């Protein structure tokens, strides 16, 4: 009896060790299948704004950017991250073939390095490079209110 409980406990522990990772799916389509889709089929999966942008065409700058990403990926050693490709194209829609690339997205001052993950498909590059410095609200300054005048200054 004790031996059966021990065997079952070992089996349960092994099942816990073997973690199953959730595979990413964009709108019900897995990443491997997304890479195989044609442009027309991929456009049908995007939200309306991205679908309109793709149907009107990405333009020469976006095409040049994708070529640079492909080149960086092909030149990268096996199991290594590709070289960073810098861009000002904040309005570029993230496509499935961009997954795994490292992109330097310009925020108006510097290039923020972002590794493209599957969860980012369909979003814009600019969403991942904030253009402003969030405010850190501290103490009120002089002239804020009458009561704040009595707060000692540092």
From Swiss-Prot:
Q: Name one GO biological process term.
A: cytoplasmic translation
A single Gene Ontology CC annotation of this entry is: nucleolus
Identify residues that carry Phosphoserine: 63
Q: Which SUPFAM superfamilies match?
A: Ribosomal protein S19
Q: Look up the domain of life of the source.
A: Eukaryota
- Pfam assignment, any one: Ribosomal_S19
Keywords carried by this UniProt record: Cytoplasm, Nucleus, Phosphoprotein, Ribonucleoprotein, Ribosomal protein
Subcellular location field: Cytoplasm; Nucleus; Nucleus, Nucleolus
Note whether Cell cycle occurs among the keywords. Answer: no
For this chain, one GO molecular function annotation is:
structural constituent of ribosome
Q: Does the keyword Cytoplasm apply?
A: yes
Fill in the subunit field for this protein. Answer: Component of the small ribosomal subunit (SSU). Mature yeast ribosomes consist of a small (40S) and a large (60S) subunit. The 40S small subunit contains 1 molecule of ribosomal RNA (18S rRNA) and at least 33 different proteins. The large 60S subunit contains 3 rRNA molecules (25S, 5.8S and 5S rRNA) and at least 46 different proteins.
HAMAP family per UniProt: Ribosomal_uS19 (MF_00531)
Membership in a protein family: Belongs to the universal ribosomal protein uS19 family.
Which NCBIfam families does the UniProt record give? PRK04038.1 (NF003121), uS19_arch (TIGR01025)
The record's function comment reads: Component of the ribosome, a large ribonucleoprotein complex responsible for the synthesis of proteins in the cell. The small ribosomal subunit (SSU) binds messenger RNAs (mRNAs) and translates the encoded message by selecting cognate aminoacyl-transfer RNA (tRNA) molecules. The large subunit (LSU) contains the ribosomal catalytic site termed the peptidyl transferase center (PTC), which catalyzes the formation of peptide bonds, thereby polymerizing the amino acids delivered by tRNAs into a polypeptide chain.
What other remark does the UniProt record contain for this protein? There are 2 genes for uS19 in S.pombe.
Could you tell me what this protein is called?
Small ribosomal subunit protein uS19B
């Amino acid at each position: 009896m004790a031996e059966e409980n021990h065997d079952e406990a070992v089996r349960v522990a092994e099942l816990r060790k073997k973690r199953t990772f959730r595979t990413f799916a964009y709108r019900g389509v897995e990443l491997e299948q997304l890479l195989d889709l044609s442009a027309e089929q991929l456009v049908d999966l995007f939200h309306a704004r991205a679908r309109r942008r793709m149907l009107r065409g990405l333009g020469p700058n976006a095409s040049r950017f994708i070529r640079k990403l492909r080149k960086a990926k092909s030149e990268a050693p096996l199991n290594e991250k590709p070289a960073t490709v810098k861009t000002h194209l904040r309005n570029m829609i993230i496509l499935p073939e961009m997954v795994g690339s490292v992109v330097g997205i310009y925020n108006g001052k510097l290039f923020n390095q972002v590794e493209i993950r599957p969860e980012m498909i369909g979003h814009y590059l600019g969403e991942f490079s904030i253009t402003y410095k969030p405010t850190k609200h501290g103490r009120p300054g002089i002239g804020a209110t009458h009561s704040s005048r009595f707060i000692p200054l540092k």
